[in-house]
């Protein structure tokens, strides 16, 4: 019953979108000299994109926003749709405790959310790093084993955060009995967190 094919399409579409942004990040320093002097902020930020680790961090943050909303949608499909309204009365007829069904569905949603973001990031960074070994856009940095390790850690960390945001949003949406609120809360929360992480990242680099 769960639209796995639709989820895979979302993952591939998101991966294509994030890959495009990743290449854009890598291209920004090359156009720094062409940016009008009046755009001081852009000039200040451009050097940030001169290393792979920062690009990976920014892409992972954006991926977290996308998959926080994805996670909320998965929780909507697995939890809110089944435990609110008429479908809940159907669950009462099952010989299994509702709490057990709820727990299994919640764990499944968490695993699916984390796996989806990890798969997406794997596609994005594998393709990006591979092309960088052939036609490097980032000057002054190199692909290394430690880079893959750091990228993997970032992807895992942010995928867990995205799933946690989806879980929190689901709890709020469950109380309000609204799938729309679940999605809105997940988007708002993830955007707020991403802005805080971006500011923190820039502060560390400075």
Describe the function of each predicted region.
Residues 20-28, 173-206:
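Transmembrane helix segments
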Residues 11-12, 105-106, 186-187:
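Residue-level recognition of transmembrane alpha-helices
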Residues 92, 167-177:
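Generic transmembrane alpha-helix motif of multi-pass integral membrane proteins
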Residues 18-29, 36-73, 104-170:
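Secretory targeting signals
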Residues 73-90:
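Transmembrane helix boundary and interhelical loop/hinge segments in multi-pass membrane proteins
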Residues 1-15:
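Aromatic- and glycine-rich beta-strand/loop motifs that create alpha-glucan
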């Amino acid at each position: 019953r769960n639209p796995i094919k639709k989820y895979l399409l979302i993952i591939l579409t998101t991966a294509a979108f994030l890959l495009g942004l990743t290449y854009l990040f890598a291209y920004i320093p090359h156009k720094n000299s062409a940016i009008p002097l009046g755009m001081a902020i852009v000039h200040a930020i451009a050097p940030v994109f001169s290393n792979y680790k920062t690009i990976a961090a920014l892409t992972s943050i954006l991926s977290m926003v996308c998959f926080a909303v994805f996670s909320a949608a998965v929780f909507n499909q697995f939890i809110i749709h089944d435990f609110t309204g008429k479908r809940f009365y159907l669950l009462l007829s099952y010989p299994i405790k509702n709490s057990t069904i709820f727990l299994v569905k919640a764990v499944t949603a968490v695993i699916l959310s984390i796996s989806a973001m990890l798969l997406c990031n794997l596609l994005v960074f594998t393709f990006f790093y591979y092309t960088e070994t052939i036609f490097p856009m980032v000057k002054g940095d190199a692909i290394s084993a430690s880079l893959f390790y750091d990228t993997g850690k970032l992807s895992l960390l942010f995928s867990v955060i995205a799933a946690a945001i989806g879980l929190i949003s689901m709890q709020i949406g469950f109380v309000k009995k609204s799938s729309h609120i679940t999605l809105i809360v997940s988007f708002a929360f993830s955007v707020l967190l991403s802005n805080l992480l971006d500011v923190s990242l820039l502060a560390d680099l400075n």
